[in-house]
Each structure stands twice: as C-alpha cells, then as structure tokens.
Amino acid sequence: MEEKQHYSPGLDGVIAAETHISYLDTQSSQILIRGYDLIELSETKSYLELVHLLLEGRLPEESEMETLERKINSASSLPADHLRLLELLPEDTHPMDGLRTGLSALAGYDRQIDDRSPSANKERAYQLLGKMPALTAASYRIINKKEPILPLQTLSYSANFLYMMTGKLPSSLEEQIFDRSLVLYSEHEMPNSTFAARVIASTHSDLYGALTGAVASLKGNLHGGANEAVMYLLLEAKTTSDFEQLLQTKLKRKEKIMGFGHRVYMKKMDPRALMMKEALQQLCDKAGDHRLYEMCEAGERLMEKEKGLYPNLDYYAAPVYWMLGIPIPLYTPIFFSARTSGLCAHVIEQHANNRLFRPRVSYMGPRYQTKS
C-alpha cells in the first residue's frame, strides 16, 4: 500500500527553496534582505542601492553607484519597433497584459539569451531594470492612445519613472516617497510570483520567460492586483463614515476586502504598510487635505476590531500612488517593476544551484476502472 504523503494546500508552510536573498522574520517583525532590515534600508537607501544589494550581494560604494546609474540610464529607452508592437494591442488591454507582452518581446533583442551564467543574467537584469519604467509607462499610455513620454537623463530613476507616468516633474518629497515605495516592493522572500519565476527558471528557461510568468502571477488580485482594488474601494466613499459603512456592508455579505491580511503576517501589521502610512500622512499634510488618511485609518481600526486583520503594503500604497497622481491601472505594474530586482536575484540564484521543481499530487479520483 502506498504511504500517505502530507498535503499542504497552497504549499502553506512548505519550505520550497534555500536562499541567501531574503527572509521574513515574523518573530522580530523584520524583512531581511541579504541580512539587512528592509525597513531600515527604506529610510536611508535608494531603490538603485537596493538593486545593487540584491544582485551583487552587498551595498554599493559611491563609485559603484555612479557606474550603476550610468548603466541604468543608458538602458532606459525602448526600441522603436518594440513600441509599435504595443500599439497593436486593443484599447481595453490591461497595463499588466501590455507589460507582459512587452517584457516577453524584449527576449527577441537578446542575442546571448541562452547564456544563463550569473554574469550574463546580472547584465541582463540591469538592462531590464533600466527599461522597466519606460515599458510600464509606455504600455499604459500607448494603450490609451497617448504618446509615450521619453525619459530625461537629468532625472533620477524614481523621478523619471514618475515623470513618464504622470507627465509632470515630481517634487523632492514626491520623488523620495515614490522611491521608498519601490524599495518596499523590491523583494519579499517567496510569494506566488517569485515561486512561479523560480519554477520556470528551474527548467533552464531564460530570465525573460521566468519574469513573464511572474507578471501573470502578479496580475491576480490575491497577489498584486490588490492595490488597485483598494483604491477603487476608497473612491466609493466620500467621508470616513461612508467608508466604514461600506466596509461593514461588505463584511455582512462575506465579501473579501482587499488590502487586509497576509499569509505570513497573520497576527501583525505588515511593517511595510507602516512606512506607507507615514508617507500618506506626509502627502496629505502637504496637500492640506487629510480625508484619505482619515478614511484609511478608520478602515484599519474597523478591520482589526471586526476581523482581527491588519493592513498590508497594498492598503496604504494605493492612496499614496493616488496622491502622487498615478493612474490606478498602473499600480500593479509599478509593483512588478519594483519587484523585478528581487525576481532577477531569485532567477540567478535558481540557475546557479538548480533542481527541477517536480512535486506530486494526492490523487482523489477513482482507481482501476474497467471498460463496461
């Protein structure tokens, strides 16, 4: 008789890989990135410094930062025929689908695509990271029949990203807050999209293929699409009491409310959400309008009281992006663009110490049926 194997739905609690990249230490409420606390990094380091840490395993020296910035800037434009491909997409295409198509198509420009060595994949990752802001912004603008906005060499990575999405030059506060959001979204151990990327990479597929699979995973509203759902929900209410009533109605109907709860942070607030909550308050202070902040706080209190659930990063990132003037359909593509750095690190690690993922199933169907 076959031995009964343990089954864990959703692979909950299953250790699927060994990694040197990141770890969610729920006991100390820390998100460790190469041994550093992500929250502390978000207060003092830029997104590009996080990119270097993730891909090189250490924080950069000043001279290395200058080299990295030049490399990223030199890769910030998209080929003209690549933009024409995006023009062929239907008008109602979601930007995540445009992003997935555009990312997959970039593989055709790589003449060394079969070289999966760490050095080749790192160089590929830097090139991709240079193009992600332009691809994210251009796919949205082209689908909506608008001209893409070209990057400005005088702007920082995050300022350029914001500029290409909104068409306006960001203030120093807006640039700082957006950059911090990219840091917070950059890496998070083994969520669904990272697992998908590593599974694909384990077949010796290329970096583009692994990232394209991750885009498809991140589009789902149980993973990345939650930030868009949060903002649409907030826009349904005009006042704090309206929002509380809206949440109560949804709870009575047993509807899922996006932006709350997390598979890992089950009994605590996502520490990244606290950073975005502070950022939202800063933006509301600057605007002289605290309505969104007060609504979010009221929702946070209500969900903790009624369901014992705490906000995750998406809950506060959504209104932050709204205050920055970013169109809602771009929220999830931003998430993916930021996470590209972590995903690339995971694919490189998977290729370097690979074993093909091949799990089994617990069969629940009939056995040994015969033809009548």
Swiss-Prot record:
GO molecular function: 2-methylcitrate synthase activity; citrate (Si)-synthase activity; citrate synthase activity
Biological process annotations from GO: carbohydrate metabolic process; propionate metabolic process, methylcitrate cycle; sporulation resulting in formation of a cellular spore; tricarboxylic acid cycle
Pathway assigned to this chain's UniProt record: Carbohydrate metabolism; tricarboxylic acid cycle; isocitrate from oxaloacetate: step 1/2
Keyword annotations: Sporulation, Transferase, Tricarboxylic acid cycle
Positions annotated to bind CoA: K256, I257, M258, G259, F260
Catalytic activity: propanoyl-CoA + oxaloacetate + H2O = 2-methylcitrate + CoA + H(+); oxaloacetate + acetyl-CoA + H2O = citrate + CoA + H(+)
Domain of life: Bacteria
EC number, as in UniProt: 2.3.3.-, 2.3.3.16
Top-tier EC class: transferase
Keyword Plastid attached: no
Positions of substrate binding: H188, R272, R339, R358
Induction statement: Subject to catabolite repression.
InterPro entries: Citrate_synth-like_lrg_a-sub, Citrate_synth-like_sm_a-sub, Citrate_synthase, Citrate_synthase_AS, Citrate_synthase_bac-typ, Citrate_synthase_sf
A Pfam entry, by short name: Citrate_synt
Location of the active site: H223, H262, D314
Keyword Coiled coil: no
CDD domains noted in UniProt: citrate_synt_like_1
Extra facts: Bifunctionality as a citrate and 2-methylcitrate synthase is likely important in the mother cell's physiological milieu.
Family of the protein in this entry: Belongs to the citrate synthase family.
Protein function: Involved in both the tricarboxylic acid (TCA) and methylcitric acid cycles. Has both 2-methylcitrate synthase and citrate synthase activities. Catalyzes the condensation of propionyl-CoA and oxaloacetate to yield 2-methylcitrate (2-MC) and CoA, and the condensation of acetyl-CoA and oxaloacetate to yield citrate and CoA. Has 2.3-fold higher activity as a 2-methylcitrate synthase. Catalyzes the formation of either (2S,3R)- or (2R,3S)-2-methylcitrate.
Protein name according to UniProt: Citrate/2-methylcitrate synthase
Species annotation: Bacillus subtilis (strain 168)
